[in-house]
Amino acid sequence: MNPPNSTCELGRQGEALAATYLQNEGYQILERNYRFRHNEIDLIALDGSTLCFVEVKARLSNKAGSPLDAVTVAKQREIIRAAQAYLTFSGQECDCRFDVIGVNVHAMHEARISSFTIEHIKDAFWVEQ
C-alpha cells in the first residue's frame, strides 16, 4: 500500500469518497469543509428534510477501532459550535443530526485510495441540553 503524501491528503480523499457515498444514498451536499473560527465541519448535507453535520475519518488500518472512537468529546464540541454558527448564519430551522463516516482504506495505488469500505454512523452524538 502506497500511503498518500500526508494525513491531510488522506483526509481529503476520504471526504470526497464520503460525499460520493452520501450522494449515492440520496443526500444533497450543501457544504464541504465549512469553517467557523477554528472549528470545521467536513460535510453538511440534507437527508430529506434533516440537516446532517458529518465528520469524516479516513483510516489506513482498522486496528484503531471505530471511527466514532476518533471523534472525542472535544471534537464533538467543536463540530457543535460550527453547526450552531451555520444554523445562525444560514437562517435554517430544521431537524438536525450529527453523523460520523469512517472510510476504512484497504488498498492504495499511486497514493490514491483504491479499495475501501464505508461505515456510516447516524446520530453519532447529540447536543447536551
Swiss-Prot record:
NCBIfam families: PRK12497.1-3 (NF009150), PRK12497.3-3 (NF009154), YraN family protein (TIGR00252). GO terms for molecular function: nucleic acid binding. This is UPF0102 protein Cag_1992. Belongs to the UPF0102 family. PANTHER family: UPF0102 PROTEIN YRAN. InterPro entries: Restrct_endonuc-II-like (IPR011335), tRNA_endonuc-like_dom_sf (IPR011856), UPF0102_YraN-like (IPR003509). It comes from Chlorobium chlorochromatii (strain CaD3).
